[in-house]
Amino acid sequence: MLDNVLRIATRQSPLALWQAHYVKDKLMASHPGLVVELVPMVTRGDVILDTPLAKVGGKGLFVKELEVALLENRADIAVHSMKDVPVEFPQGLGLVTICKREDPRDAFVSNTYDSLDALPAGSIVGTSSLRRQCQLAERRPDLIIRSLRGNVGTRLSKLDNGEYDAIILAVAGLKRLGLESRIRAALPPEISLPAVGQGAVGIECRLDDARTRELLAALNHHETALRVTAERAMNTRLEGGCQVPIGSYAELIDGEIWLRALVGAPDGSQIIRGERRGAPQDAEQMGISLAEELLNNGAREILAEVYNGDAPA
């Protein structure tokens, strides 16, 4: 491969391609003369569209094929939505850069109603996320929550066709696709705690590829990386995959990390919450200790049920 060429493995959804082009533009701005090529591919998560993600099982539904391309040297980097990135990486690969975070909140989207609380009893709300489901069901047990799969455009079409009264999407994805006008309300973390890494774009590469790591260094956003480190440390201890009823959100306020997390029963009957505040250098340990607290307070039993009896130790 030529020294001035960098290949990006990416999914082919409009949002994934936006993220890949975002990284491409940042790289070319930082390194004039660099030629950046996209290597689009299809992942298992893109193909299995008729089953709720939680039932598909497995981790890395949206990243495995990209990682194989890295290992086989068909690409140099893979660009991911951080909320899709598993807690473990194949040997030789790792997350080396996290770009500046977009708005991490969930979005309430409806053609008829202005807010979650304005929905009449019995309204049908679409989401494929157990994390969103459990928080919705806790706040509004009178709603009917149905699975919703597909890319952002597909989900909006299903709403527009009348299959749902409202759907929940990520604010970041809608903003990136120029669809911010579809957001009726951004849900604060107190109502819908975001997913681990939500709104952040991560870049994975071969750990022994010094040239690529050097090119990527300029794209790393230190504050976002600290926040996502705390969130992912918590998720790692909980052995969380992409599709589990786990929420985690870290903010950096006055030089201190404030980490909030929850584990919920998908039907909203029980949600275990906790939080930590501490120094940025302790981000990883904070995440681990908060996870331990959640496990001891009942999260272990909830996760055992979700994982079919295989709970975190």
Curated annotation (Swiss-Prot):
Tetrapolymerization of the monopyrrole PBG into the hydroxymethylbilane pre-uroporphyrinogen in several discrete steps. The gene is hemC. PANTHER family: PORPHOBILINOGEN DEAMINASE (PTHR11557:SF0). Its cofactor is dipyrromethane. The keyword Chaperone does not apply. One of its GO terms (molecular function) is hydroxymethylbilane synthase activity. CDD domains: PBP2_EcHMBS_like. Belongs to the HMBS family. It comes from the Bacteria. Pathway: Porphyrin-containing compound metabolism; protoporphyrin-IX biosynthesis; coproporphyrinogen-III from 5-aminolevulinate: step 2/4. The porphobilinogen subunits are added to the dipyrromethane group. It is an enzyme of class 2 (transferase). Monomer. SUPFAM superfamilies: Periplasmic binding protein-like II, Porphobilinogen deaminase (hydroxymethylbilane synthase), C-terminal domain. InterPro entries: HemC (IPR000860), Porphobilin_deaminase_cofac_BS (IPR022419), Porphobilin_deaminase_N (IPR022417), Porphobilinogen_deaminase_C (IPR022418), Porphobilinogen_deaminase_C_sf (IPR036803). Its EC number is 2.5.1.61. This is Porphobilinogen deaminase. It comes from Escherichia coli O45:K1 (strain S88 / ExPEC). It holds the Pfam family Porphobil_deamC. Keywords: Porphyrin biosynthesis, Transferase. Binds 1 dipyrromethane group covalently. One of its GO terms (biological process) is protoporphyrinogen IX biosynthetic process. Gene3D superfamilies: Periplasmic binding protein-like II, Porphobilinogen deaminase, C-terminal domain. It catalyses: 4 porphobilinogen + H2O = hydroxymethylbilane + 4 NH4(+). The modification S-(dipyrrolylmethanemethyl)cysteine is found at residue 242. One of its GO terms (cellular component) is cytoplasm.
